[in-house]
Amino acid sequence: MRRPSSRLQKDSGQVIVFVVAILTVVIGMAALVIDGGSWRRAQRHLQTAADAAALAGAQNLPTDQSGATSTALSYAQTNYPGIPAPTVTFPDTGTIDVAAQTTAPGILARIYGSVFNTVTVRAHARAQVSVPLYMKNVAPVAVKNTVACAATNPGCYGQTVTVVFDESQVSSSTIGLLNLTCHSTASTACGSSSGIGGSQLQSWIEDGYPDALPANEWYGVKTGETVGPITHGFEARIGTPLFFPVFDQVASSGSNYFFHIIGWAAFVIHPGGITWGPHDRRLTGHFTTFIATDLASGGQISGATDFGVHTITLVQ
């Protein structure tokens, strides 16, 4: 009579072991779903904070790494309150790295050991500042590279300057009107710009040229335009940045002139800073820095083609 009892006890023990094993698996799966999901959400939240920090800090580059660090830390901790201060480094003058980490609690997973009481989640973001190789919303006014503020001279920005266009001496002018509909790698390929009228130039000044335009190409210089529309266009943009192509060379073919465009500058016309008559054409204002957010990454900053207009992109 003892044999059946022993067998029942043995079977009962096996059932208990089986149930415990099943419960362990079920709890493990629940931990994977609940805790794993929680940890992934924490990591995504942390990554968003790191991305925001890198993009914000990059706006201070290349001249102010201290300011970039302060801005990045502020943005990171605003977007994820309570996290430890991220580590901010600069691989080069135009790049900022933000490495952040925090802990996320375990709920069910902690039954498998104290190591799962909390887990460390990490995030890394890298933002890069570059010079746009293409520019949108460009005004049809080119400025000489020796007059535009270089990014390597930050004290130049905000200083009042007057730029002059003299049709009788285009090659020595510090600004010039451009035909933005034609550009080429060949210096004189665009020919005459006589088909571009004053109303068209006014529209480009007020609204910017609608297409992205390339640097490192030649553009035709527009002369003989109607004075009134140009003046009205400039008046409509007083106090707001105008994007000027920057030229370094002048070529000519007969009576036609061409500027070689190497980069982009942002210029703000001051109130009362417009003198645009038949023989006296001047603009008074200041150059400023500008961050373009809707352009692809471009060339190296702080070089000969960097005049303070930058684009910022997340590269990691």
Indicate residue ranges for each PLM-predicted region:
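Alpha-helical assembly-interface signal, strongest on the long, hydrophobic N-terminal helix that forms
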Residues: 1-72, 154, 158
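Short amphipathic secondary-structure patches
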Residues: 2, 37-40, 44, 52-108, ...
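N-linked glycosylation sequons
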Residues: 22, 66-69, 73, 87-97, ...
